Amino acid sequence: MYKRQVLLTETGYLKRMPVSEFEATSRGTRGKAGTRSQGEDAVKLFISCNDHDTLVLFSDRGVSYALPAYRVPQCSRAAKGTPVVQLLPIPREEAITTLIPVSEFSDDTDLVMLTRGGFIKRTRLSAFSNIRSNGLIAINLEEGDALTWVRLAVPGDSVLILSLIHI
């Protein structure tokens, strides 16, 4: 198993790169870009995983999708990547909001989900071990709401949620 970096852009492009693409630089140097921005596109999510991990992707509509990490095409840092809609049966109007790498779907780990409307849900990670190819509804949303945040949690973890109220 090889350690990889998986990157998702704001416009829905996904790519996998070896960790060796990101080597340490000396002090005072400019560093290296993780990707070339294509106009308005920016990096949305950047995670580390192994090739045999399962990537669980969550959409703004509350649907989860599973994709083996090795199925994400490996690219160079300069490459744009592959559109998620070419890898999974995701409707074009649906956007991926979270990407979780999973090595093992254990019963002692939970997923904590938060919606734009302030609803929170905790579900066992093992409930996502058999996601169908067309996805699995992770959370039912009210009209106008969207799934915005999903993280792994184990017993004893705390979640602090802040909200900005515009007056």
Description of each model-found segment:
Residues 1-5, 165-167:
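Conserved small/polar residues in nucleotide/adenosyl-binding loops
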Residues 3-106:
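Hydrophobic core positions in small helical hairpin nucleic-acid-binding modules
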Residues 12, 62, 118, 165-166:
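Residue-level signature of catalytic and energy-coupling elements of molecular machines
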Residues 102-165:
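Conserved structured catalytic cores and adjacent interaction surfaces
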